[in-house]
């Protein structure tokens, strides 16, 4: 169920649309637009990527409503270890990026991006490995099974990997690859973009489940899925602002078990954010409520045409939400 009352006029009255400049290109963008909802229970973030159509983006709106109108789950831990995130940058930029994640002992490195070669991926991973003891890579489904098997060999020639995140696009490919290689496999898109988020686990196609609050419909929806998964869970952001990061930390703090560092340190990828970014202490963040700074909201406000674009998007997604919930 979607928390209420969250009528469409009420949502739009509480809306702030911001454009956050990024330090480096990530997912092909240099500015991250998100819509924030100032609700009676707190702040929610609707940041479905621009190319997502309403049927997929609606879950992200559900997450924003959940945060703005609902109540957070009980906190089980006050410290969430995080990983550094390294985009597809030249090796020379790696030290500067890692410095934004003080104390992090795990790093996730983007690989298999358009225009990048396996050789450049290996160089980037090795540059990270020289500075951080635990390395995982994220291919965003960019490889075939054969390419992923080849990459697994190349990327582990100079040291181990914690896991390969979404090396191939489909559940069938992940299952086949898992039979062929020894490197653990984590599923991300195969969970958050699937009609059945549990299919990849039932197929024995992953060793780790990467769960993201917004695409799964909110903190409570994520925790419900996590309770049905019998493999370790990693909570990660979807290039969220400080508001979305707070929701991710809330989810991570509520899990019964947390075996791996979480991908919730991505606030360091922004030049400016809507609130003062949380600084990791000894590689960890504490769950806490985030209230955007009014001055930052004004300074980072999106252009009028972009604000209207997000209003139209919410209008398109909202009916899909409540149809799904049975209201």
Curated annotation (Swiss-Prot):
NCBIfam families: PRK02901.1 (NF002782). The gene is menC. Mg(2+) binds at residues 138, 165, 188. CDD domains: OSBS. The keyword NAD does not apply. This is o-succinylbenzoate synthase. Pathway: Quinol/quinone metabolism; 1,4-dihydroxy-2-naphthoate biosynthesis; 1,4-dihydroxy-2-naphthoate from chorismate: step 4/7; Quinol/quinone metabolism; menaquinone biosynthesis. Its EC number is 4.2.1.113. Its cofactor is a divalent metal cation. One of its GO terms (biological process) is menaquinone biosynthetic process. It comes from Mycobacterium marinum (strain ATCC BAA-535 / M). HAMAP family: MenC_1. Belongs to the mandelate racemase/muconate lactonizing enzyme family. MenC type 1 subfamily. GO terms for molecular function: magnesium ion binding; O-succinylbenzoate synthase activity. PANTHER family: O-SUCCINYLBENZOATE SYNTHASE, O-SUCCINYLBENZOATE SYNTHASE-RELATED. It comes from the Bacteria. InterPro entries: Enolase-like_C_sf (IPR036849), Enolase_C-like (IPR029065), Mandelate_racemase_C (IPR013342), OSB_synthase_MenC1 (IPR010196).
